[in-house]
């Protein structure tokens, strides 16, 4: 937990401070701080589910489940804070886009937190450590690493108003999709040759599908970052258009 606290402190340095800030500016700064805290919690949750999978650490997996309640509480607080800003300040232009973007980012992060909790529950209910051959052939650890790297990079894009980095997410998610597609074949082959380890196969493929959904949420977040900075709505646009 100390590591997460230190990381949060480092990220708070990216949030601008000014002696001439208006009340709305102060509220937006606080809102960005809260969403950053939630972001780092979700990243930590995914790291822990990876570790609990590798080490078959049920206690760590239970810690992930317990922490999800804190993420849910923070999501509700951010929602309320956004509603208060709408009601009290009637923001316009870039301020309005910032609040709208954070509101949607908040939802995507909360869902990613739910996914981490769901993955942790597979480790909790599994009867045996996961077969290393299955872990290797499905590339689930590589998928974990890429998903977490994408989640960390969309945070950097948010903190630095970096639309180029945000746009790179659309291309990088292809690796996550590719692993997901290949894993279906790998798991089917594994179950056929290891009929006594069907549970392993079903749990691993379920984890991979959940990680693929985190990648989708990261793409949604990248769209909101671009909307916030450039006032461009990318929803329903083709991948080629999003990358332009």
Label every PLM stretch briefly:
Residues 2-244:
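Cytosolic, long alpha-helical scaffolding segments
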């Amino acid at each position: 937990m100390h590591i997460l606290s230190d990381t949060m402190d480092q990220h708070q340095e990216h949030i601008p401070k000014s002696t001439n800030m208006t009340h709305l500016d102060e509220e937006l700064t606080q809102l960005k701080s809260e969403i950053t805290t939630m972001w780092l919690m979700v990243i930590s949750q995914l790291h822990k589910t990876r570790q609990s999978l590798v080490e078959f650490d049920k206690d760590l997996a239970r810690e992930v489940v317990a922490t999800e309640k804190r993420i849910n509480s923070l999501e509700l607080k951010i929602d309320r804070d956004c509603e208060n800003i709408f009601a009290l300040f009637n923001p316009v232009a870039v301020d309005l886009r910032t609040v709208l973007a954070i509101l949607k980012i908040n939802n995507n992060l909360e869902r990613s937190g739910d996914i981490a909790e769901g993955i942790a529950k597979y480790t909790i209910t599994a009867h045996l450590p996961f077969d290393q051959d299955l872990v290797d052939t499905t590339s689930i650890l590589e998928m974990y690493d890429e998903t977490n790297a994408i989640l960390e990079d969309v945070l950097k894009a948010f903190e630095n108003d970096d639309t180029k980095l945000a746009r790179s997410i659309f291309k990088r998610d292809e690796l996550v999709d590719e692993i997901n597609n290949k894993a279906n074949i790998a798991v089917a082959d594994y179950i056929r040759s290891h009929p006594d380890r069907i549970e392993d196969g079903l749990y691993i493929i379920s984890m991979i599908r959940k990680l693929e959904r985190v990648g989708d949420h990261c793409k949604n977040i990248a769209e909101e970052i671009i909307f916030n900075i450039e006032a461009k709505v990318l929803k329903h646009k083709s991948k080629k258009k999003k990358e332009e």
